């Protein structure tokens, strides 16, 4: 069995911010997202006991974010170049996988391998007040999976599973422009963020449909956390960063 599909998503947003404090600030933000994706999957039961799976997927994401901030100075509004920015983000992910399923009298086995390549480019041109924040990031990872289930008596079973997974930073966390919550708290993205990679292992005893008891192990590298940086003047910048392993 072979199936294929394609998708397109378009999203646009606009937001105004008005902060009335010691320094009156007005922000005009807008942006758009274009997402293209396509995938194909093959399922081939080539014998009574074995089934082969294979597939490929590609996705392209393009994001354009604009933030224009102005401060009230006297009776006129003046642009704030420290906070304003125009950020373009492009991401391409290509992936392919293979998996083999095997079923015998008392043992079921699933073994797979997925290869992913990610290419990211972000561009934020600098100005006299703000340095260039453009960046590129390319990485390739292999993700093996394994699941073994052994059937016991009376519908009970033992299972052993392993999988390697990835959690990518979301687009907002990579965006270097500043989002103002209030006069004391600013949000700012981090273009140097790396994805989280985790290894997960579980051994479980399954008692029919009643309950499941297991032992699990997880190791995660480059965990993404929120950091809080005091910039003085009672202003705190909240920014994501990778926790050192």
Regions found by a protein language model. Give the residues of each.
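Outer-membrane beta-barrel strand-turn architecture
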Residues: 44-48, 101-106, 142, 150-154, ...
């Amino acid at each position: 069995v072979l199936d294929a599909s394609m998708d397109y998503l378009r999203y646009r947003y606009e937001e105004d911010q008005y902060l009335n404090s010691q320094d009156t600030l007005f922000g005009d933000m807008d942006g758009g997202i274009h997402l293209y994706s396509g995938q194909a999957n093959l399922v081939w039961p080539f014998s009574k006991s074995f089934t082969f799976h294979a597939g490929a997927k590609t996705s392209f994401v393009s994001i354009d974010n604009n933030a224009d901030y102005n401060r009230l100075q006297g009776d006129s509004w003046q642009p704030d170049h420290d906070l304003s920015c125009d950020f373009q983000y492009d991401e391409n992910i290509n992936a392919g996988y293979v998996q083999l399923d095997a079923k015998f009298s008392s043992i079921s086995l699933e073994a797979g391998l997925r290869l992913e390549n990610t290419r990211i480019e972000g561009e934020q041109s600098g100005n006299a007040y703000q340095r260039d924040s453009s960046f590129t990031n390319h990485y390739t990872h292999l993700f093996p999976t394994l699941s073994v289930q052994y059937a016991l008596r009376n519908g009970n079973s033992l299972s052993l599973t392993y999988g390697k997974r990835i959690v990518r930073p979301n687009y907002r966390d990579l965006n270097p422009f500043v989002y103002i919550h209030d006069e004391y708290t600013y949000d700012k993205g981090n273009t140097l963020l790396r994805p989280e990679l985790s290894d997960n292992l579980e051994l479980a005893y399954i008692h029919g449909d009643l309950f499941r008891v297991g032992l699990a192990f997880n190791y995660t590298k480059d965990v993404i956390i929120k950091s809080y940086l005091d910039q003085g003047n009672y202003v705190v910048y909240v920014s994501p960063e990778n926790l050192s392993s």
